[in-house]
């Protein structure tokens, strides 16, 4: 009888370990990337994972959560900025993806906005 119980317990443990491992198998696809953007224009930073099942997303700027405003907000798993501002949007942006069942979170690589001045950007496109 104890052998049967040990086998049953072993099977249950394997099933639970296998289920947990499968839920936590996700990676960024696509991961956020640094971009050039003209100050005052809009930008979208993409973020998604290979397996969205039970995944919640949020963004950080220099390690602090990005709060939704009318100018900057999370759109699904992406971050949108309608009016890029050098003072408010410069820094290290990261997407955080968390499996809400297990609590395991992945932090993306750093993405930065290379914010170009309007004056400099226009001279690039319309040389004098």
Question: Where in the sequence are the language-model features?
Answer:
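Immunoglobulin-superfamily
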Residues: 2-128
